[in-house]
Amino acid sequence: MRMRTGFLLLLVLLAFPLAILGQDATPEATPEAAPIELPAVDPLAVTGDIVTAGSSTVFPLSEAVAQLFIDEGFSGAVTIDSVGTGGGFERFCGKGETDVANASRPVKDSEVEACAALSPARTPIAFRVGTDALAVVVSSANDFAEALTCQQLAAAFSGQAATWADLDPSWPAEAIRLFSPGSDSGTFDYFVEAVLEAEDCGNLGDEAEAAILGAANIQFSEDDHVLVQGVEGSPYALGYFGFAYYSEEADRLKALAIDGGSGPVAPSFDTVEAGEYLLARPLYIYSDATVMQDKPQVADFINFYLSNVDSVIGDVGYFPASTEALNEARQAWLDAMGQ
């Protein structure tokens, strides 16, 4: 019996340091996926024109990539119309008159159906190109508001709060002058969904869009520069638009921190990258495999876009997509081209 007890004790003593070693061992970090490399594109060798239209948010990013494409030798024309995401899909799917649609939201089922009804039919392919943070802004002359809860933001844009004092009794009893992108804008769609419809925010459900469209003292525009100027013009104005437009006028505007339930968080590279800022959203360009195969210049432009977007996106004022998201976009390009 003593020998058996001693044997068991020996096993315990031997196992103890192994357990300690196992606890101290540091698990290996999962390596980040290597970027997929697309075939090299020489802009000097690309001929033909490219027509794009859509999101005003994606517009400055596409403009920067197109300028780089031209700077490196492309001699054709790149048309980029800022008509809102909905307007872009109308021209791409409803009329079939553009090669690329710029979008600040995913394509809707109704838009996919419109693409399928074209002759020849189109199938929209999404290419993720970056991330935008929606900036909720006031004039730099506003000296009382630094942050809003998601519920306060929803109350303002749904018309439930008419004055700043309705949001916070310590703020002025002055009417809130609202500025919003129009209903054709993907930015508008995203705001309605993320702020007004969301259960933990506005909780307006199917009534959300009607609420903002019926709000008093609100100005809508598909031109973000009009919204910027409107907010700049009054200390009692409140607006929202893509972070790049805020960045251009940061000396005259103030971006408010947004509290989604874990404390106020201001938009920045770090907070967007960490997933801490509530109002961050993906940016896309869309095309179709047949369009890309029939128009090599379109395929080459999208290839160039996906290969070079990270070199310009920071200067524009947006945030890079993850390697994984860009790899999915690059793989979608390869699949569309049968490679």
Predicted regions, residues:
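Short beta-strand->loop
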Residues: 51-55, 138-139, 164-184, 287-288
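N-terminal segment of the mature folded domain
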Residues: 31-159
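Small-molecule pocket liners
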Residues: 125, 131-136, 175-177, 253-254, ...
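Extracellular/periplasmic juxtamembrane helices and adjacent flexible linkers that interface
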Residues: 2, 42-47, 275-276, 284-339
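Short helix-loop capping/hinge motifs at secondary-structure junctions, enriched
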Residues: 141-147, 184-187, 201, 291-295
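Ligand-binding pocket segment of bilobal, Venus flytrap-like solute-binding proteins
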Residues: 89, 180-265
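Ligand-binding "clamshell"
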Residues: 111-126, 247-273
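Ser/Thr-rich, Proline-interspersed low-complexity disordered segments
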Residues: 9-44
